[in-house]
Amino acid sequence: MERSYDIVIIGAGAAGLTAAQYGARANLKTLVIEQTANGGQCLQIEGLENYPGFPDPIDGYDFTERFERQARQFGADFAIATVSRLEKTGDRFALETSEGPVDASAVILATGAKHRHLGVPGENELGGRGVSYCATCDGPFFRNRRILVVGGGDAACDEASFLAKLSDKVTLVHRRDRFRAQPAVAQRVLDNPNISVRFNTVVREIHAVKNPMGIEQVGAVTLEDVQSGAQQRVDMDAVFVFVGSIPQTSLVPTVAKDEAGYIVTDQQMETEIPGLFAVGDVRSTPFRQLVVAAGEGAVAAHRATHHIRVLEGNVYQEVPA
């Protein structure tokens, strides 16, 4: 990893990888920093069905690999590292990473969001021992077992449908009286004989049992009917939680955010700090989809290119947004 770039992109999901492609294609020295594996939450997708140009379902790994390959072909650099500090000094941004310092003229935040927890007893204690936030990662461990899915959005319904391929004992609970998921996604769940749906229901506690090796793992849950208040203990072997996300904004504590903590930008994806952009799941937007995130990445890279050209004194005629 070199030390000086035109654009540094933090995060390698659909938004970050698209920004990398457009930045590198503009002949700008572009670096993508990802702390784990490139792809972000795309990697959890078992079958992507609604991305334009892909009439047949494609899994998240293959989808990500195509994005990354295209960005590399245009010359983008990639690094596996953690960014611990980001600050602006003059016209440049300084970043401290686990692989050393880096500076850039523009930074695109594509840091995404992490899974929101239920906050109930037993959840943290049994993480990795039956409590999971990724069905494609951990679902195969619970083939033909009793599985509980929590949530009512697209993610919960998609993951429940995936888990129903592994077990005919899947229960989906949602605190409201109807799904928030897109109608087609929700209907797939309602039509699946392997999925039992319980509306107006929340999880109050996750209980442990000891396996033959003496290790505690998920054994049951306490469910509560939000209308009657009645509680019921139900035997379960796994709990998969999909109840929303928390934007990853710790690098920019003073940047403007909406009431939910997502970064606020203008239509060009730029924050109130010139040269600092936010795209994808970390950004305040009414509609979170991969195709939207990719579009945001392209817009941010285009605007970052203009920002850099201004700094260089090489301004081109802008096309109105």
Annotate each PLM feature:
Residues 4-6, 80, 99, 143-145, ...:
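Phosphate-coordination loops involved in phosphoryl transfer and adenosine-cofactor binding
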Residues 5-74, 145, 157-183:
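Beta1-alpha1 glycine-rich phosphate/pyrophosphate-binding loop at the start
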Residues 13-14, 37, 113-115, 154-155, ...:
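Residue-level detector of alpha-helix initiation sites
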Residues 71-97, 101-103, 165-267, 306-321:
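A Rossmann-like FAD-binding core segment of flavoenzymes
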Residues 78-140:
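Glycine/small-residue-rich loop that forms an oxyanion/phosphate-binding "nest" at active or ligand-binding sites
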Residues 117-118, 157-158, 180, 231, ...:
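Glycine/Thr-rich phosphate-binding loops of Rossmann-like dinucleotide-binding domains
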Residues 119, 124-141, 241-292, 296, ...:
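FAD-site-proximal beta/loop scaffold in flavoenzymes
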